[in-house]
Amino acid sequence: MDSVSFEDVAVNFTLEEWALLDSSQKKLYEDVMQETFKNLVCLGKKWEDQDIEDDHRNQGRNRRCHMVERLCESRKGSKCGETTSQMPNVNINKETFTGAKPHECSFCGRDFMHHSSLNRHMRSHTGQKPNEYQECEKQPRKHKAVEKTFSYHHCFRKHERTHTRVKPYECKQCGKAFIYYQPFQRHERTHAGEKPYECKQCGKTFIYYQSFQQHAHTGKKPYECKQCGKAFICYQSFQRHERTHTGEKPYECKQCGKAFSCPTYFRTHERTHTGEKPYKCKECGKAFSFLSSFRRHKRTHSGEKPYECKECGKAFFYSASFRAHVITHTGARPYKCKECGKAFNSSNSCRVHERTHIGEKPYECKQCGKSFSWSISLRLHERTHTGEKPYECKQCHKTFSFSSSLREHETTHTGEKPYECKQCGKTFSFSSSLQRHERTHNAEKPYECKQCGKAFRCSSYFRIHERSHTGEKPYECKQCGKVFIRSSSFRLHERTHTGEKPYECKLCSKTFSFSSSLREHEKIHTGNKPFECKQCGKAFLRSSQIRLHERTHTGEKPYQCKQCGKAFISSSKFRMHERTHTGEKPYRCKQCGKAFRFSSSVRIHERSHTGEKPYECKQCGKAFISSSHFRLHERTHMGEKV
């Protein structure tokens, strides 16, 4: 069995963590370290530096870094059995008892207990970086690849890992590996949820010391931008801000070449290539690439809505939704497009709009190749492939792919319509619906197709129209493989498989799969036929029927088969015709399994099992399975030859 090394048992503090300890905790740390030294038996090297606190005060270095490095280095030449008298003992020197620090820096006047500590400190003034390492056979302390020199051997060893890419610290939960121990420690907190830094004023806790520092209530912002005057609490934030003026983007992705001004944005971007999702929900097991997405997801379980409007009391899951809502009270639209001058109530909406001018779409779907302007749009699109529906209605348990669809559905239970049109007084459940409605008053159509010039009031209609040019059909039925341009058409199609008929006639209780079918059916009871043909006077129940009828006068047949050239008046007849070429029979009888090309055919066939004959002759009482058979029978009474 391998002997235990000092690295295996030593406790490591960062400079920030050390600053949070009180005097009793620091004393306890020194006692523990002392006990650790005494229990190790295979070390072999006399220690020059016996001042733990001087080690800590070396700015930017670990609390015990010199101690660790020298102990670990000395093990290579040590012999087992040497006594522990060679261990450093912070209490054995006279200076330690008295607290005297006889070694003074001639540059800055700082005092040190030990000469070795003073020597190391002097290098910060002289810039000296010794090129020989005495304990390693006089080998130069230089890195061969870049000829970079270091003042301390432990820094040299750490730097080497940046070239060798050795990552000795691996997370047991997600497998992510790290070059250095401290980032590994910090990463582990993201899994454990540990937040060791607590604000004494408000009780808020933080994973990272830097976040804790930035949160401070002092109000001090010592770092001010000379160009715009904006001030910052921490230097890193100030540095990042300066890059917005200079345009500097020092962090470049090796896979796609995209550059970033901030390392956090760069690391986040890398996950789009690796697919890494380090944040996992304990309740449902769903994993996320970004901490912010993970936090937002947790609210779907807890129901927490931390953002509340002071005017109307409405609460929101997300800060962005809250900010957008607040503006509905004021009517302000402070964000203006630089190209066309259009104003928006949120910066995000403005940025999305600006991409319509430049055409930038950096996020591409790996399954179908479609690209998007925003990562959130890509994630939402991916659900059309996976069928994922993470949003569930608490009242009826219906699930949805998008949070917006859930919110829209929830209003069917509450009936709430908080958004009112100032011109006509009409109310809406959503601000987006109000915005679309307002365009009917001002005739605004901001979404224009670059291919044909057609303009649209609504971005969703515009996207659907674009598919008529590209031929894209992103919604695929898992049962029969049929694909659709619109999600609404896809959902309606699914009902042909499930048999779901949610729309019921109040007069005769007949049910329908589609609301449009119910509306058309209701006209049968009223007998009203409001759509009349101007040429022949024939009246129809539906506007779609009169449009088809008018084509019999004009001879227009807009739907042409690419295989045989045959043209059709209606899209439905065209689709039916296509099946004669493909042989597709998507409609199957649930009782005997027989398949049919047309839904009407399967309905008529099913009546052969049920015995239903809905078409009855008023003259003789004879009943028929299908309307076509019934019409043929009627002619026998009129004297027509069938």
From Swiss-Prot:
Residues 4-76 form the KRAB domain. One of its GO terms (biological process) is regulation of DNA-templated transcription. CDD domains: KRAB_A-box (cd07765). It holds the Pfam family KRAB. Keywords: DNA-binding, Metal-binding, Nucleus, Repeat, Transcription, Transcription regulation, Zinc, Zinc-finger. Transmembrane segments: none annotated. GO terms for molecular function: DNA binding; zinc ion binding. It is found in: Nucleus. A zinc finger (C2H2-type) spans 103-125, 141-163, 169-191, 197-217, 223-245, 251-273, 279-301, 307-329, 335-357, 363-385, 391-413, 419-441, 447-469, 475-497, 503-525, 531-553, 559-581, 587-609, 615-637. GO terms for cellular component: nucleus. Belongs to the krueppel C2H2-type zinc-finger protein family. May be involved in transcriptional regulation. This is Zinc finger protein 14.
